[in-house]
Each structure stands twice: as C-alpha cells, then as structure tokens.
Regions:
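Papain-like cysteine protease catalytic cores
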Residues: 2, 8-24, 33-133
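Exposed substrate/partner-binding surface patches
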Residues: 2-20, 128-290
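Generic detector of short alpha-helix boundary/capping microenvironments
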Residues: 24-27, 83, 98-103, 150, ...
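Generic hydrophobic/packing signal
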Residues: 25-28, 35, 43, 61, ...
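Conserved, well-structured core segments
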Residues: 27-30, 34-43, 109-112, 184-185, ...
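Processing junctions and N-termini across compartments
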Residues: 30, 105-108, 154-161
Length: 290
C-alpha cells in the first residue's frame, strides 16, 4: 500500500472511529466514474462544509472526498432526483455525520368518524421530501402563505386510513418530532420538463429562514426551532453546483471557480437559467450562533 494512502486511512480513523478502510478497499482502482455523480458528490460535500457543526472537518476535505470516491458506487448515471440517494449513501458511509441530520417523526391520528386514537412508531429520516410542483400549487392557492406554512399544508394533505380496527376513513395526521436536528434538510423533487418560469416560481416560494415548529409539533424549547438556510445543492444541466451563504453574501461554487451572487433575490433570479435547488441545508440558528 502507498504510504500516502496509509496516512489518509489513519487520518480518517482518527476523525471518525467508526470508519475503517481495509487494504483491499484502499488499493482498489476507482475506474471510470460518472462525471455527474462525481460532480454531485463534490457539491454535496461543499454544501456540508458550510455548516458550522462540520467546521472542524474542513481541513480534511480532501481526505473525506478521496474516501468517498473509493467507497461509493459512482460509475453509473444518477436517476431522476438521485442526488438524494447519494446524500444518504454518504451518511451511511460516515455514520457519525448522520447524527446531525436525523429526525424522528411521530405520527398521531384521531379519526373524525369513529374517534379512534392512534399513534404510530417513530420513523427515522434524514430529509423532508417536497415536490416542486406541490410548492407551486399551494402557493397559487394561498398566496400569502410563508414557505413553512406551505410545507405544513402539503404534509397535512398526506392522509392515512383509519386502522383496521376502525372505520377505514382517510384522516389528517398530526406529525411531531421528538428531537430537533442540528441540520434540517429539505429535498426538492423535480421533473425533467419544468420551464424556466416554473423553476423561478418554485424557488420564489423558498425562504432563507424557517420555524420547524410551524411544520411539526415539536417537543422541547421552541427557541431552538428556528433554522437558517446555509447552503443548497443545485442541478444545472448535467452538472451540480453549490450555492452557499458566506461572508454575508450568496456565492455559487462551480467546478473550478466561485461566482458571487449577492443577496437572496439574486439567487432566485439566477434560477431562471434552469438552476434547480435539490437539497437545502438549514442549520439551527441557536447552535450556529453559539
């Protein structure tokens, strides 16, 4: 094994004790990788480095990048919205990272007809998936609604049938999270045929600050339910970019350069160039300021 590879393996194990690379893993040739997958990986990592809880890992960016290039399967094109799955694969490869993103959601339902009261087991997830078309539709119907209220409406419409012991009627579900994550992640699902105008209308709905307590019923101190957008993974053609908030302005990371965007209105405007935000990372405001 090359001495430099040994040093990288040892460095990874120091950073995350759960990580281990065997000699075979480290020496396995990468082969021909899919350019879009490699682009997506780079921009997911770039977005993550902009989150404060990962600040201590930034100096090891190249180590993590090299490890994931070898560990993940990046030889085949991503499927539609497949960047979400790649993000989950990263968290699976680096399990300690997942602790910052995980959300345990509890669903409660009281049937309006038979009054059967049900509480479902907590489900673990790492992101909230929202359809881009649903954002546009709800915004069109409720023009004064904020981003978080629009998400609340979308989630409320996800009804569940009354249990087999009840009447079977579809009922609204109250959703609660028992532990606030350090990073609240939203994944936007797109089709491949949105017009530039539809992309613009979708991004216009987004906000840079959200209160998770509007979307869910949250246990604990409500002072910790406010989150601020710090970075986004975006798709532009067949390449991924990272849009991040740095030094009081928004910038866009391309393959080998940084484009200064400016304020949030400018971020929305550049999406007329068919730039689709796909993963949004919101960091807890209180934790970020501490």
């Amino acid at each position: 094994m090359d001495p430099s590879n040994v040093q990288e393996v040892e460095k990874l194990e120091e950073i995350d004790p759960d990580l281990s690379l065997t000699q075979d893993d480290a020496e396995e040739p990468i082969g021909k990788l899919n350019a879009t997958c490699v682009s997506a990986l780079a921009m997911i990592l770039k977005s993550i480095w902009n989150i404060n809880v990962f600040a201590s890992s930034r100096e090891d960016e190249s180590v993590f990048h090299e490890f994931l290039l070898n560990d993940l399967s990046l030889k085949h094109p991503l499927e539609a919205n497949g960047v979400f799955d790649l993000f989950l694969n990263i968290l699976e490869a680096l399990p300690n990272w997942g602790l910052y993103f995980e959300v345990y959601e509890v669903a409660k339902k009281i049937c309006n007809r038979c009054k059967l009261d049900l509480e479902y087991p907590a489900e673990r997830s790492f992101r909230l998936i929202i359809s881009a078309s649903s954002l546009r539709e709800v915004k069109s119907a409720f023009k004064d609604f904020t981003f978080e209220n629009i998400i609340k409406v979308i989630k409320m419409n996800l009804k569940m049938p009354c249990d087999k012991e009840g009447c079977g009627k579809q009922s609204y579900v109250h959703r609660m999270i028992t532990k606030l994550p350090s990073v609240f992640t939203i994944a936007l699902e797109w089709t491949k045929n949105e017009t530039a105008g539809e992309i613009f209308d979708t991004v216009s709905v987004l906000a840079t600050e959200i209160n998770v307590n509007v979307i869910y019923q949250c246990e604990g101190d409500i002072r910790y339910t406010k989150y601020r957008l710090v970075s986004m993974v975006c798709l532009h053609g067949n390449r991924y970019n990272c849009v991040a908030y740095e030094n009081n302005r928004w910038v866009r990371y391309l393959r080998s350069e940084i484009e200064v965007i400016g304020d949030w209105e400018n971020v929305v405007s550049i999406c007329l160039k068919n730039i689709r935000p796909q993963i949004l990372f919101f960091e807890n405001v209180m934790q970020r300021e501490q």
